[in-house]
Amino acid sequence: MPPIGTFNTMRIVCISDTHSMHRQIEVPEGDLLIHAGDCLGAGTLDDVADLNDWLGTLPHRHKIVIAGNHDWVFQEAPDHARELLTNTNYLEDSGIEIEGVRFWGSPWSPTFMDWAFMQDRGDAIDRYWQPIPQDPNVPITHLPLKPLSRRPRIKRQRTTSAA
């Protein structure tokens, strides 16, 4: 692999679902670290401060964080949680351009169980997903933008043979 920073490239490292166990993982080198949600376990402001401190120790030039369905504090105390994130760019239905690459982050997911950042399918969630620009190079969400249940189904045919 060429060294990081050569050939006008950006090496992006994406992690998610660390659930406050971020200090226990090895993060590969890169230019940009994306944490795509479920950063927290219990989801307290102290957990956010610890996440921020950890992010500050990583060598990546740029960092982006979005919330996920376990990251309640970003929904219940959003201003306080965001204030604690000084070592990253927190995206919530917003975007940023880094080195000419456009990123857009959204924490919203179709409702399943009773988690944070959930909206019912259809108009409710579309209210959050429709504003996503058509031109981000990298959309970042905690779950797929197009739920798997909307994928076309492939009809399979079983065959048996006598041996």
Q: How would you describe each model-predicted region?
A:
Residues 19-20, 71-72, 108-111, 144-146:
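Short, solvent-exposed loop/turn segments at secondary-structure junctions
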Residues 1-9:
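Short, Lys/Arg-enriched N-terminal segments with co-localized hydrophobic residues
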Residues 10-18, 34-36, 100-109, 137-142:
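Active-site-proximal beta-strand elements of phosphoester/diester hydrolases
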Residues 19, 25-27, 116-135, 141, ...:
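Active-site-proximal loop/helix segments of hydrolase catalytic cores
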Residues 15-98, 161:
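Core catalytic region of metal-dependent phosphoesterases/phosphodiesterases
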Residues 45-49, 122-126, 158:
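Structural motif corresponding to alpha-helix initiation and N-cap regions
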Residues 40, 45, 112-113, 135-163:
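Active-site-proximal segments of metal-dependent phosphoesterases and phosphodiesterases across multiple
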Residues 81-107, 111-121:
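Helix-adjacent hinge/juxtasegments
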